[in-house]
Every structure is written in structure tokens, then in C-alpha cells.
Amino acid sequence: MGQKPKVAFICVHNSCRSQIAEALGKYLASDIFESFSAGTETVPQINQDAVRLIKQLYGIDMAQTQYSKSLNELPPVDIVITMGCNVACPYLPCKHREDWGLDDPTGHGDDVFAETIQAIHRNILDLKGRIQNMI
């Protein structure tokens, strides 16, 4: 197999959903694809509830390994996944694009965050399977 496909997870601020997707993509599917995330805007730090829950659930410390990035910091990617930002994401050249339609859990309780994390987990595994079947 040649190079692994590069997947970019995109949302507005690159502080919560796309960061979770990048972390879980690396954790669950790094053998199949490379994970990146970015936003149309950036924030000084990623969502602290997301950091706390991903550390509790998966042992991943996103505060140490990830930061909010803008779209122009991405390498060329093969697949673009938007999180459901309800904004028109700028055009990023890619071979495949899809929207996961996930509501932002920011400002909600841990139960809403956990539901979002589980949805992203399922979507990452589904994407991994689809990419494996294409290779």
C-alpha cells in the first residue's frame, strides 16, 4: 500500500468536535489514515471539557498533543470531514468530502459531550472501514 490517505476534520474554531475527531482518528485508525484538524477561525486553547473527557475515556492528553489550527496550516488532504458547523467551509481540494452533522456540545453537560464523543468514535470506525475497503 502507498501513502495513507490524509483526513482533515473541520469545524469553525477547531476547539472541540474537530479536535476530538483528530485525537480519535489517531487513536483508532492511524494504521489506515492520517488525521488532521483545523478551523475557519482559531482559539487560544481547545475546549477544556473535551480535553478532560478524552483524557478520562481514552487516556489521550489533547492539551499536550494538539492545538487550534487554521485551514492554511493543513497539508494537502484526500478527505475532508466537516463536523456540522452550519457554515460554508472554504473550498479545500480533496477526493472525498462529507459532513457528519454533529451539534457542538460546548456549554452543555458531560452527558452531551459523551454522546458527541461516542458519535465521533462510531464515525471514525465507519470511515476507517470504508477506507480499508477502498484500498
Where in the sequence are the language-model features?
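Short polar/charged helix/loop
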Residues: G2-I135
